[in-house]
Amino acid sequence: MRMPRTPLALAFFTAFALMLSLTVSAVGLSGCQNYDTLVQKDQVAQQKWADIEAQLQRRYDLIPNLVAVVKGSAKHEEDTLAKVTQARAEASSIKLSAEDLEDPAKMAAFQKAQDNLKGSLSRLLVTQEAYPDLKANAAFHDLQIQLEGTENRVSRSREEYNAAVSDFNAELGKIKGSVVNKATGHPFKPRPYFAASAESQVAPKVTF
């Protein structure tokens, strides 16, 4: 036979139920906030990547004009010009989706292609030292300035993207971020960085 609940017991039970409900609600609210934070930081990283793509496209667009100008003055640089054209084609053919940005192997392939293009461009630019007419060419000089500006913006965009990736990965690596990610089916993955290789930062030697 069940004993009747006293007013004190009922009050205790009610208070306990209320506290439990508030706790569950607080946990749920915190989880939603943490999820929203991950989404927001992920979107920032994606936007920063879009900025990189815009600057890389600017680089792609400048190369044909640069090749044409060099071809008109540097008659013996067919191999260098061919390598630049090929490197541009290979780099511009690699398109990364949002999912690809989470794949270290695909990011590495993209990075390698960009490093190869940058190296080819650097070797092309130093050919001016062997061709006075090219060095004095106003169109070449203008394109060189535009390319240098583009490279600076690529570098800055890369730094901003890597900062956003670091921020996102740090949030995902926190206990609350990890718990929320697991509870929602692991929609988020750590992002690899987009950092130029050490080789691509070394200026080519001028040997004529």
Ranges and model annotations:
Residues 2-208:
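A helix-centric hydrophobic-segment signal that preferentially recognizes long
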